[in-house]
Amino acid sequence: LGLVVVDEQHRFGVEQRDGLRGPHGELPHRLVMTATPIPRTVAMTVFGDLDVSVLDQLPAGRQKISTHVVPLAEKPGWASRLWSRAREEIDAGHQVYVVVPKIGDVGDDTEEGVQLFGDGGREGAKSSDGKIRLTSVTAMNAYLQDVPALSGVRIGTLHGRMDAAEKTRVMTAFERAEIDLLISTTVIEVGVNVPNATLMIIMDADRFGISGLHQLRGRVGRGGAAGTCLLVTRQEADGISRERLDAVAGTTDGFELSRIDLQQRRRYSGGRAVGT
């Protein structure tokens, strides 16, 4: 083996890269690519004898992506505007992703689960133990079925517990514009290309890391129309979570986001760049 080309470099771990060694420990030439550098990538660049080439232009045919933080703790009334905004995109002939951090638990499709979104703010989102309940595919699907602004909209769901055939069926339907709004977990993060999708709404965006958010929003704006990503959070304005969201909203430069990520780890995690 003489040359290895690795796309989505940030998706591979140390052991997977170590598996490329030859029988006598020799390494092939490597070309690694990523649009989403992570602190481990920075460490490899500094200490791993990598030469760096930066492409700072959008690929041909891609449009800019605008990203905005939607702070429901301060602006609970903005919750209803999310779905009006989604309807505007759908009426314009486009499609929408709604990304959530979990698949669902027993009861998420009941009235109790739907109350998760009742007033858009923190109080309607708390469970019996006082913690904010994370948005799930199950609860979001149940909720959106009754949102007046989305009346008549074809809604689909996608998550990792579905078998491969069912996931393929759903994604094919979305690619063919047979689904207008797709509720999904992060299974769409890599390898999904639907040029007609122009809006992504990420619920509980504070539960995702910088690189994950940057990777997710790259699913929109892949065609002739500009993309928009809305980072929805119920966390208060102060704290590292909101700082992270503001950073993602402030730039689409993956290397700058990696620098910010590393800086935050230095401040809040004792400088750990690659976890434990």
Pin down the residues of each PLM region.
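Flexible, glycine-rich phosphate/dinucleotide-binding loops
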Residues: 39, 61, 105, 164, ...
